Amino acid sequence: MKRLKINYILIGVVTLLLALALWPNITWRGGQGGQLEEIKSRGELRISTLNSPLTYFTTKQGPSGLDYELAKRFANYLGVKLVVIPHKNINDLFDDLDDDDADLLAAGLIYNQDRLSRARTGPAYYSVSQQLVYRLGTARPKTFADIKGKLAVASGSAHVSTLKQLKQSKFPDLSWEASSDLTSKELLEQVADGKLDYTLGDSVTIALLQRIHPQLAVAFDVTDEEPVTWYLKRGTDDSLYAAMLDFYSQMVDDGTLARLEEKYLGHVGSFDYVDTKTFLSAIDSVLPTFRSLFEKYASEIDWKLLAAIAYQESHWNPQATSPTGVRGLMMLTRATADGLGVNDRLDPEESIQGGALYLQRLMAKVPDSVPEDERIWFSLAAYNMGWGHMLDARKLTKMQKGNPDSWVDVKQRLPMLSQKRYYPQLTYGYARGREAYNYVENIRRYQVSLVGYLQEKERKAAQEAAEQADQGKGYPAVTPELALNF
């Protein structure tokens, strides 16, 4: 899969040009009438969104998601409260806009010309391609002419418009079903489960779901990269639109947009079927032996992250030993183990307790200037290569005019720690920075797989329990709506 990157220079230039074009009509700074003044008088910015692993979901810690965080920041920027209206169906989003129940749609929607008669778009904040998906083990189609079976897409999605264009221009015999009951994510899951032959999805959602459904396979790209944008009601004044342009320009300039992309999309890289399949198998067969220990000693972090670290270190093998002498589930060196009070590195409980304590000590060293949700990545890189080399990575980032408190900036410098043109200038010298980079990225992917896979098992178990309970009641089973949140 293509690495997802935002063209921040292009976004900045386009935003500036649009702002200049709109400048004579901008009323929001003076607060004189218009849609923005209505929002400020109301004290609320109302957004309609979709429940999904990327856009908006809820956890024990509260709401989360890329679009939620962007919208929350926009509401704060405007000085109002954010009100979120979640939906399952895309058509409901645009109904909210038409009925003035929402001020904007923040739902990870692809730019689509068919929607422009009802709404206008905001700036792009990342891009995706539309892809045809099939189940691994079945025949891979090379074009739509090779499709033999049922193709379904979500009603109201950009995929419907894409298929209509293809039918008109290239494939007159192309047919599909537009489902109003199932979301794009649910259709992808049906393909993974063998209940549907094909569907279209966006490259980000597909990449996320492959972490828990490795049998999902991409046949081919249906479109080139397309922008993902917010939508506003067409026909209103430009005050809210102009404020949005200014907000996005600021987000690009201060690096916030890059940080959010890193948080939600940074782990979406190349997909390894064998590695993912092996990991998911280990979740069922090996993890139950150690789960209670991970839960017991993961005090400052999610136990699933601690488990992901251990898998990256040893593949959950308590007897693991490397040629350099590191040993055990958490692969501790003798010196580190002595400093942590670990007597037997091959004892699973001692190893997990020691590794968790070592990680806590590293997290305590991370400067307070580093954002709370990024501190763990600095700590993990240091866990792999040592705290001194992490200081060097921050130093090099600052030397190159980057932000030493931003993980997206610092991680780009990690591979440079092994390059002769850089490491002689640094305090702690040569380091295997590329290994540290891959180490953190792998752990992030394992964590995503673990969280998603366990939630999927819980969802299926709840569904089966509901169906069994309803079998004797004389009415159809109702599938509970349990969102898959990464």
From Swiss-Prot:
Q: Where in the cell is it found?
A: Cell outer membrane
Taxonomic source organism: Serratia proteamaculans (strain 568)
The way it spans or sits in the membrane comes to: Peripheral membrane protein
Which GO molecular function annotations are given, in alphabetical order?
A: peptidoglycan lytic transglycosylase activity
Q: Which reaction(s) does its UniProt entry say it catalyses? A: Exolytic cleavage of the (1->4)-beta-glycosidic linkage between N-acetylmuramic acid (MurNAc) and N-acetylglucosamine (GlcNAc) residues in peptidoglycan, from either the reducing or the non-reducing ends of the peptidoglycan chains, with concomitant formation of a 1,6-anhydrobond in the MurNAc residue
User: Keyword set for this entry?
Assistant: Cell outer membrane, Cell wall biogenesis/degradation, Lyase, Membrane, Signal
What are the start and end residues of every segment in region (Non-LT domain)? 22-268
The protein, known as: Membrane-bound lytic murein transglycosylase F
User: Active site located where?
Assistant: E313
Q: Which GO terms describe its biological process?
A: cell wall macromolecule catabolic process; cell wall organization; peptidoglycan catabolic process
PROSITE patterns, per database record: TRANSGLYCOSYLASE
Report the EC code(s) recorded for this entry: 4.2.2.n1
